[in-house]
């Protein structure tokens, strides 16, 4: 399975959320293979300790980039980048979430989102809402899942 290098991960997070968080500082040191390249697929395997760090990093990214109560211009800019007033522009939360998630997943996966991926993400949103999460909390839950997906 292909994964991002630490630098690629941090840069992708910066591009997605518009903030530089450097969450990979707590990741295990990357090994450089005989090729001399950091991004050689021969050395970028996924250790269990690294997977745990990815899960923690996804939570950290969502918490720091999209806090429940934004207090800085950077927070408001990031929220605008992700949520984009879709809830006001669409007739239902499900339509709004589908629009927000389609845009985010396309950027996160660096390719067009498939119909099945969007359906699955929207279903996760609906389940989150059914479990008592707010609109934004349910969106953030799906975003966190996307950040640990092999497609990311």
For each predicted feature, which ranges?
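Low-complexity, glycine/serine/threonine/alanine-rich intrinsically disordered linker
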Residues: 1-152
